[in-house]
Amino acid sequence: INCRYNYFSTLNLTGLTELFEIDCSNNMVLNELYVPDSNKLKTIYFENTGLTSIDLTHSPILNWVYGGFNASLQSVFLKGSPFVIYHLNQSPNLQYFCVDESKVVTAQNYVTQLGYNCVVNSYCSFQSGSEIYNIEGNSVFDSTNTSCNTGGTGVPNMKVQISSGTQSAVLTANNLGEYAISVGQGMQTLTPLLENPSYFNVSPTTQTVSFPATTSPFTQNFCVTPNGVHQDLEVAIIPTTPARPGFDAFYKLLIKNKGNIQQSGSVTFTYNDAVLDYLSANPLATTQATGTMTW
């Protein structure tokens, strides 16, 4: 459907589920656009409009989103479209961009390059024009049950679920165990998630915070302590490029302590020296022989 250069203030297309392309660009009075729940919609243009917010979360096969030159645009909801390419240039008032968890880093880099002061996450709780509140904290592992408040070791990449009503998302902490998210007003519930929950105790097990009643930023830390003694070491090899005859192949060797006590030892990587030639390793192996490397 092509409705460029029109004077609609509201455009409701919710019943047109067979649409594969929408173009409503250059419509400066358009401030409400209702997009259909469609498994066929692939492309949408809404450049140079008066829109403040657009929800595209019900169009799972979207490939192209053109939303540039929108001075009033504050929020874009694009979660649920894993293969989409978007253009949001010249929309400097964009405050919130909701995408799939796997796309958060890419989307954040994109809006940063554009110079926007924009929150990007997979938690679609923010409403256009509403106040933004911040939640932050860290997760600390205390092996002796004594040092959570005085130090301890950050739990890298620990996951924290956040939910509000029907909306939920999972945050992943950084290498130091630190996490942060921006949310809209209302009740928010934080729940730490562990890969092996029977190995650990976490305090608190859940935390609820309500905005604007609570001052922003709100800090919530989690203390993780061992529950019994569990040895659980995982070793995996991950190819990062396809193995092709005559070409270099790259692999990552991942050693992960999934238990709750410190472990030590060595790991040996064995390969078929008849068909593979060793080139390099980082870090260098402690010992090396034909077809084997040990760290």
Model-derived regions, located:
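A short, solvent-exposed beta-strand micro-motif common in secreted/extracellular proteins
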Residues: 65-68, 86-88, 177, 185-199
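Leucine-rich solenoid repeat scaffolds
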Residues: 71-129
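Short beta-strand elements of extracellular/lumenal beta-sandwich folds
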Residues: 236-265
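Conserved hydrophobic position(s) of the canonical leucine-rich repeat
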Residues: 8, 19-20, 30, 41, ...
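Short, acidic Ser/Thr/Gly-rich low-complexity loop/linker segments typical of extracellular
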Residues: 145-154, 162-178, 182
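A short, amphipathic beta-strand motif
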Residues: 135-142, 177, 222
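Structured interaction patches on ligand/partner-binding surfaces of diverse proteins
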Residues: 82, 106-111, 183-187, 194-221, ...
